Amino acid sequence: MRNICLLIAFDGTDYSGWQKQHHANTIQGEIEARLKRLSVKEISLHGAGRTDAGVHADGMTAHFHTDTRLTCNDFQRALNRMLPGAIRILQVREMADDFHARFAATGKEYHYRLFTGGVIPPQKRLYMLHQEKPIDQEAMQKCLQIIIGTHDFSSFENTGSRDKTRTGGKGAVRTILEARYEQFEEDSWHFVFIGDGFLRNMVRNIVGSILEVGRGKESVEWFEQALKEKDRNAAGPTAPAHGLKLFQVFY
């Protein structure tokens, strides 16, 4: 059997997340259905993680095993021809037998995007959170500095985020290597998070809490204490899904 790895970009607007579900349109489900047509048998696609409904990706990775003789280029061309335009296969590679897209990953990079102008262009409304009023960037940068390093992120963890068979004794402890807020276009900013792993909705919960500080509703001290509490109820709201993008997975 061959072990094939896909590099995938997708627009998650019209999908119920990555993971295959009964009676729901998902990224994994769409790709597996096309792989079945190409190989004339059921194929299980294993992703590097699970994105929620409405979340986008520039660099999701996933692998599957197959005995088909199709080349990597053949797979890429065929899948892109068969898949909806919202899902693109950027690269196809044959990997070692023991490669696993999820368990071999050493880290991930997520971006959360904001549009800060008065009127958001229609083509950006599905991919950026509109923050029309000015926000305190200095206070938000201080919050970002607080989460860099190794911490218990229970306060920013939603229920069901951990696979109990794969915790490795870490629980809700994760290491954030980089966390910053920066401009990338006119009136366009993003939070950038790079870490060894992320809990369910962790990025969106962190962003939602930091925006509470940026909007003047809470203080930097409140954010720092929320992290220490290890209690989801101590932190702020979950930021909307459409601003979040999985940028890349590290190996």
Curated annotation (Swiss-Prot):
The keyword Isomerase applies. It holds the Pfam family PseudoU_synth_1. The active site is at residue 52. Its EC number is 5.4.99.12. Disulfide bonds: none annotated. InterPro entries: PsdUridine_synth_cat_dom_sf, PsdUridine_synth_TruA, PsdUridine_synth_TruA_a/b_dom, PsdUridine_synth_TruA_C, TruA/RsuA/RluB/E/F_N. GO terms for molecular function: RNA binding; tRNA pseudouridine(38-40) synthase activity. Keywords: Isomerase, tRNA processing. It catalyses: uridine(38/39/40) in tRNA = pseudouridine(38/39/40) in tRNA. Belongs to the tRNA pseudouridine synthase TruA family. Formation of pseudouridine at positions 38, 39 and 40 in the anticodon stem and loop of transfer RNAs. Homodimer. This is tRNA pseudouridine synthase A 1.
